[in-house]
Amino acid sequence: MFESLAWTGLLAFAAVCGAATTASPSAIAHSYSLTTSTHLPFPTASLSNSDTKSYLTSSWPIYDKTIDDAEDISFVTDPFPSGASDSKSPVLRVTYGKGSYSEGGGGAQFTALWNPSGNEKFQSMLVTYEVAFDTDFDWVKGGKLPGIRGGPKENGCSGGNAADGSNCFTSRVMWRTGGAGEVYSYFLTPDKLCDNKNFECHSDGYGTSIDRGSFSFVAGQWNRVTMLVRLNNPLDTANGQVALYHNNVEAINQDILQYRNSDDVYISGFFFSDIRFAGGDSSYATPTEVHSYFRNIEMWGSTKAA
C-alpha cells in the first residue's frame, strides 16, 4: 500500500512541476501490479542466419514456429557495447536490404506467445527491449518496431487488416522521418477519438498513429523502449491504456482506447514486427543496406484489465 501511494504521489508531483516521469521497467510493472514476468533468452555466441532461425523457433515461444523473412535476421556481436554486464552477449540483428520497403523487402515479423500456466488470459502487459540502429542509418519516411498483440486472430491487425473488436489488436512502435517516434495501433476508433489531435486515424483499414513525434530515436546507440498495454474494461467502454517510455522517460500515455468489444480478445504476447521501411511505394525505400539490433527483451503481465 505504501509503495503504491508513493508512486501515485511521485506522478502527481511530476505533473505539477512539469517534470518528465522517469521509471525503470520493473518499477512501472510493480506500479501496475504486473507480477508475472519472463525474458526471452539469447545465445552465448553469434549464430548464422540458419542457426538463428533454429534457435528462435526452439527457444522462443513463436506462434506456429513461423518467422516472416527469417533470412534477414541473425545473432551477431554487439556493435555498441555499453559496458553493461551483458554487453558481451550477442544481439539480434535485423537487415534491411538496399531498396527495400514494406513487407517482403527487409526486416522480420513473428509473435512470441506468452502463456505461463497454459490457460492465462493476460489483460495487461508490459514489454521492454533495447533497440539500436547503424550509425549511418537513414530513417527515410518510417518503419515499424516491436510491441504487443492480442486476440484470437494471430495474423490480423497488420498490413491493412483492420481490427473489429473481436478479432485482434496490435500496438507497435514506429519511427518516422528523422527518427521521430510514435505508437502505431490497430484497435477500434470510437466516435470523436479521431478528432483528438493526438491521434491520426486512417479510414482504409490501416492503424492509428498516437502522439507522433513525442520522442526521437538516436542512431549509433542503444535506445530503451518500454510499452504498457491495458485492455478496456467493461468491453463497451473506451478506457484502455497505452503508455510508451523512451529511455525510461514517459513519452506517451493515453487511456481513452477501446481495444475490444468481445472477451475473446486478450493479450497474446510480444509482437516482433520490425518492418522494412513500412510504406506503400519506393519513396520509403532505404538507399543502402542498414540494420537494427535488439537485446534485453522482457515482459510482465497481469489478468487484470484497466
Q: What residues fall within each predicted segment?
A:
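Low-complexity, Ser/Thr/Pro/Gly-rich disordered linker/stalk regions
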Residues: 17-223, 227-306
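Fungal secretory targeting signals
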Residues: 1-23
